Amino acid sequence: MKENFNVSKLKNGLTILTYNMPYVHSVAINLIAKVGARYENEEEEGISHFLEHMAFKGTKTRTAQQIAEEFDSIGGYFNAYTGHENTVYYARVLSENCHKALNILADIIQNSIFADEEIAKEYQIIMQEIAHHHDNPDDLIYETFYNTVYKGQPLGKSILGTTKTLVTFTKEHFLNFIGKHYNAENLYLSIAGNIEHNKIVMIAEELFASLKQGVKSSFIPAKYIGGKGFIHKELEQTSLVLGFECTSYINLGQLYQTYLLSIIFGGGMSSRLFQSIREKLGLAYVVGSYNSAYFDSGVFTIYASTAHNKLELLYREIKNEIIKITETVSTEEIIRAKMQLRSNLQMAQEQNTYKSEEIGKNYSVFGKYILPEEIIEIITNIRADDIINTANKIFSGTTTLAIIGPNDLNGF
């Protein structure tokens, strides 16, 4: 409900967003920094993710152990993650411990010390993360896929960075990056749960007043390139990822048309890919589709794994299904897909972790809170022709194909 949502802006520009859920006992906190891997230049590749790792390694007032102990003492859960477009620090605690959790979070964001020994230690941990990533066929094929989709662009590069850049990072690098991006205009504090907005604003004024106003960060616009990427690796199966350019998340009408297309095409057990490729032909255990959306671009992705000698047949059958969905979509498929989308959206409204993410993302992207009812209306008004037109627009574009396996793949 809109009356449960409130927004305020501090004098320094920090945006405070709350959604009151009086029937729960906890609060979910998200501090969103509008900076991620796509904001990095070549010398900074991996620094957003590295910085997120360093958030728990000590501040001017707390050691790393004290940070861990203080969160454990209030029974809280605290973590962070890095994407291409933002970095998010989040916590979930009982409502009575919200002030304490925000105190720790504010300390981490504003007062981390980046000790040399902790940087060296975390560098080794991230190197292990990269090694694990390269040993995982799924991670490897998607890295190759996005490198091909956005060739030579920050949006196509791994958030983990490379050995070449990571080894160079010092305390000064982290402080400079924070100074450039972690300012009040570039941060959004979103909280959902059993809270009062005015109290949260007062706490935020106390804890975040020293943040400089700064300016919003910018990035280089993405351009879909496409092409082919092959990885030779001795595996039990060969996997492929097939992609096409689709809408960004800015156009909500097109975005939800694409969501519905993805559900019908490869979004579950009743989807066309699952029924054809797995149930009817027995070509794959894993097969499906989804779409990834960014501020200025998007990718519709189809994935599957099969026996080495079935790869060409699998690829051919996927292409056949693509042709079919550009021609017709049944009423039953649309009803089923709409119900899946609506159910997921409405059931998520009951979770304060989801609401905190939702209001934060809405406001950081659109500058407003988009009501669930508005989204449901968009979904309800989508027709079969809309989905068919979306399918034709997407599948007539440049193809990206990534394959990993032991075979000679030059024929593709």
From Swiss-Prot:
The lineage of its organism: Bacteria, Pseudomonadati, Pseudomonadota, Alphaproteobacteria, Rickettsiales. Its EC number is 3.4.24.-. GO terms for molecular function: metal ion binding; metalloendopeptidase activity. Coiled coil: none annotated. Zn(2+) binds at H49, H53, E129. This is Uncharacterized zinc protease RP219. Transmembrane segments: none annotated. Its cofactor is Zn(2+). Disulfide bonds: none annotated. Belongs to the peptidase M16 family.
